[in-house]
Amino acid sequence: KKKVPELRFKGFTDDWEERKLGELGSVAMNRRIFKDQTSENEEVPFFKIGTFGSKPDAFISRELFEEYKLKYPYPEIGDILISASGSIGRTVVYQGEDEYFQDSNIVWLKHDDRLNNKFLKQFYSIVKWQGLEGSTIKRLYNKNILDTDISIPSTIEQNKIGMFFEQLDDTIALHQ
C-alpha cells in the first residue's frame, strides 16, 4: 500500500515516510525564569502561557536575557513555538525578536533539515498529540510530543505544502 495523500501537488509521486517526531528532533525550551527575576518594566518581554501569542505582562533584564540566550536553548528564526499547557498546541512562529518564553509551558522541536518549519506549523494545526486522546490532563509533556507520529514527504514537497497553506492563511487574515 502506497503511503501518499489522496490530493497532491503535480510532479510529486514519492511515498511519504512515517516517523515519530522524536526521530526527527528533540524538545527544547528556555531556561526557567523565577518571579523575582521579572518586572513590569524591564527591557526584554517575557511570555508566560497566559500571554503567549499576545502582549507580555512581564519583562526580564537585558543582562539576564543575553546570559541565558548564550548559555541555554533558544529558538531560531522560523522555529514553531508550541503551548504545552492551557490552550495546548497553540503555535507562534518565532520571528527573531528579543523575547523570552516560560520554560516547559512554551516549547519547540529542535530538528534537522529533514523537517520544514512551514510544513511543521501546518502539521501542528491538525495533529492529535500522542497520549492525549480522551485525556483530562491539560499538559503536553515532551514524551507526548516525541512519541507523536508524522508522515513526511520530501523537503521540497514539504516546502510547497507549507507555502501553500501560509499563503492561504495570509489571504484569510487579509479578508477578516
Short names for language-model regions:
Residues 22-25, 35-66:
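DNA target-recognition patches
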Residues 58-61, 135, 174-176:
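Short, tandemly repeated low-complexity microdomains enriched for cysteine and small residues
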Residues 48-49, 59, 63-125, 141:
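A short beta-sheet element
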Residues 8-31:
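Non-catalytic DNA-recognition/assembly elements of restriction-modification systems
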Residues 14, 129, 154-155, 170:
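Loop/turn elements at beta-strand to alpha-helix junctions within RNA-recognition modules
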